[in-house]
């Protein structure tokens, strides 16, 4: 705030001189109030600063408003011709109810960052209090970090990145589900193989058991027949 205060201090004598030439003295008193700080983006087309003033003991005639700019260069007076054309760099609009004056800065650029001071004076009054300046509004125009082309490219890139991340997540979910279903299918196939093998073994054991029983009965029957033949027949004797 040091350099800003210094510029304001250097600017006040020059502004007072201009206001003194505009209005020379009486019993009228003017009070001026301005917003202290205003910050806008470089992408804005225009910005409007307000200047509120009040009067005591002044004639019922419109006062004259003057605007001054104090930047990195020499202080300069703005809109000495009124700046009523909206096509100009600066446009001044006055409203008397309430007592307000507006300065619009068109076609904003970073070079428009400065202190804008509003001065109000009654030209036909001789009192020094009939002219007064505000403390000034510090206008800061922020430069954009990226151009429109770069911002559009970043938006498209972000959209593509979102689509890519979504695709990767979907692929991961599908692979995870397929892997989780794989062991289950293998377990099902293995259980089916085991059950078929068990059934085959049971059938083989049953066939083996039947064959063993048949073969074991056959020698016993042959031995019984031979014994019957060896016994003497009572009828023949």
From Swiss-Prot:
Signal peptide span: 1-27
InterPro entries linked to this entry: Ig-like_dom, Ig-like_dom_sf, Ig-like_fold, IGSF6
Organism from which the protein derives: Mus musculus (Mouse)
Tissues expressing this chain: Ubiquitous with higher expression in immune tissue.
Chief location category: membrane
Name of protein: Immunoglobulin superfamily member 6
Membrane topology reported for the UniProt record: Single-pass type I membrane protein
Entry's transmembrane regions: 153-173
Biased composition (Basic and acidic residues): 215-229
């Amino acid at each position: 705030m040091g350099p800003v205060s210094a510029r304001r201090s250097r600017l006040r004598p020059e502004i007072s001189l201009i206001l003194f030439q505009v209005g020379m003295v009486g019993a009228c008193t003017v009070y001026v109030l301005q917003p202290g700080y205003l910050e806008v983006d470089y992408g804005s087309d225009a910005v409007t600063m307000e200047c509120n003033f009040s009067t005591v003991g002044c004639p019922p005639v419109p006062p004259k408003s003057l605007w001054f700019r104090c930047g990195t260069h020499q202080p300069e007076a703005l809109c000495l011709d009124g700046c009523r054309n909206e096509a100009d760099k600066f446009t001044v609009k006055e409203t008397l109810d309430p007592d307000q004056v507006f300065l619009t800065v068109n076609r904003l650029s970073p070079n428009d960052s400065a202190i804008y001071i509003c001065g109000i004076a009654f030209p036909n009054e001789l009192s020094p209090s009939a002219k007064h300046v505000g403390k000034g509004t510090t206008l800061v125009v922020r430069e954009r970090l990226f151009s429109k082309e770069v911002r559009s490219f970043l938006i498209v890139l972000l959209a593509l990145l979102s689509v890519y991340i979504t695709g990767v997540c979907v692929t991961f979910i599908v692979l995870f589900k397929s892997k989780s279903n794989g062991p289950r299918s293998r377990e099902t196939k293995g259980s089916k193989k085991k059950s078929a093998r068990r059934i085959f073994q049971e059938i083989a054991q049953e066939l083996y058991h039947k064959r063993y029983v048949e073969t074991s009965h056959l020698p016993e029957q042959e031995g019984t027949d031979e014994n019957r033949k060896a016994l003497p027949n009572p009828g023949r004797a």
